Design a protein with these regions (language model features):
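Phosphate-binding/switch loop-helix module in NTP-utilizing enzymes
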Residues: 141-205
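C-terminal regions of RecA-like/P-loop NTPase motor modules
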Residues: 6-17, 109, 113-120, 125, ...
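Structural recognition of the conserved hydrophobic beta-strand(s) that form the central parallel beta-sheet
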Residues: 176, 209-216
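Helix C-cap/helix->beta junction micro-motif
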Residues: 83, 206-208
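Alpha-helical scaffold elements adjacent to nucleotide-binding pockets in ATP/GTP-utilizing enzyme cores
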Residues: 72, 98-103, 157-160, 195, ...
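Cytosolic-facing regulatory segments adjacent to core modules
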Residues: 36, 43-45, 79-170, 295
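The Walker A/P-loop phosphate-binding site
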Residues: 2-110
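Hydrophobic/aromatic beta-strand patches that form the interior of the parallel beta-sheet core
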Residues: 55-57, 88-90, 143-145, 212, ...
Length: 308
């Protein structure tokens, strides 16, 4: 027992050297964040998706949070050609092939409605492009988990992937979890969320590992009192379901919001425009970055956001 406990204790000399190694690695670019397509987002988040970090991305239904996360999953492959990685996506809200459908929508500039022949059959030329891009996507180092798991099952899957594909290499390990409230319960919602966040805190301590989890907003932000008061338009910590557990575990807490879908024409005390706009609020930045708002043009018809 004493020997096991001693493995949990490390002297300052070891931890300080780890800090030196990390700063040195960032300085000589042997350790890098994974860039996304959004320069302002990258700037606020230490260059992109940073190792040993938990990101929480929250929003109401229809806000674009899943599309935002989906773009990140392919961006980090496309925009970081010198980096090796493994991406594990827990796609609990939709089956994996529909996630790929969203990626095809973005890359081909076709709506998913068009790709799925909802009104007219997809034309031959576009279908050939679907096949071509899909064959490229088959080479991406991405794996999917479609079925909801308990926190312990998620932890076992993460450990398996780390030991099988990451351990002993310099690869990035990116875990994406869509989304937290769809976790198979082990008790109350609060108990389940607390255990899930324990899993993510543990996982981010693996070398070169990042966790991105999606979360749901509660209904508070949709109340008439909030909608009719510009001072109350912006999302707050209390608007996120299971906020205490998520905030404690997260290095970044990000809320994606489309005030337009709530009927708001001028957003917040600064009267920001809402037509075809999506706003990204960074509510928490553990590295002391100030809370900020990033503006995007709504391109969600093609499962994309365009940084303004």
């Amino acid at each position: 027992m004493e020997q096991n406990l001693s493995n949990l204790i490390r002297p300052m000399s070891v931890v300080a050297q780890e800090a030196i190694n990390y700063i040195s690695g960032r300085r000589d670019h042997s350790i890098t964040s994974l860039k996304t397509r959004w320069a302002k987002f990258n700037k606020q988040c230490m260059g992109g998706i940073e190792p040993n970090t938990v990101y929480t991305i929250a929003g109401i239904s229809g806000s674009g949070k899943s599309s935002f996360a989906n773009e990140i999953s392919t961006d980090i492959v496309d925009l970081n050609p010198g980096e090796e990685m493994v991406i594990l996506i827990f796609s609990l809200e939709m089956v994996g092939f529909r996630q790929v459908g969203r990626t095809l929508s973005s890359k081909l500039r076709k709506t998913t409605s068009t790709l799925y022949s909802s009104e007219t059959d997809l034309d031959d030329d576009t279908f050939r492009k679907v096949i071509s891009v899909s064959n490229q996507l088959k080479e991406y180092p991405i794996w999917f988990v479609d079925n909801p798991t308990t926190p312990k099952e998620a932890e076992d899957i993460i450990k398996y992937f780390y030991n099988t594909y990451i351990k002993g290499t310099d690869k990035h390990f990116v875990i994406m979890y869509d989304h937290a409230l769809l976790t198979k319960p082990i008790g109350s919602v609060i108990e389940t969320m607390q255990e899930l966040e324990r899993v993510f805190i543990s996982a981010k301590k693996y070398p070169m590992t990042s966790v991105l989890q999606l979360a749901q907003m509660n209904r508070n932000i949709e109340s008439p009192e909030r909608i009719n008061n510009p001072l109350s338009h912006y999302p707050m910590r209390s608007d996120i379901s299971s906020a205490d557990a998520l905030f404690q575990a997260s290095d970044y807490v990000i809320v994606i919001h489309r005030p337009e879908i709530l009927g708001i024409q001028e957003y917040g005390p600064s009267h920001l425009p809402t037509q075809n706009k999506v706003y990204l609020h960074i509510l928490k930045n553990r590295d002391a970055g100030k809370p900020c708002i990033l503006e995007f043009q709504n391109d969600l018809a093609y499962n994309n956001l365009i940084e303004s």
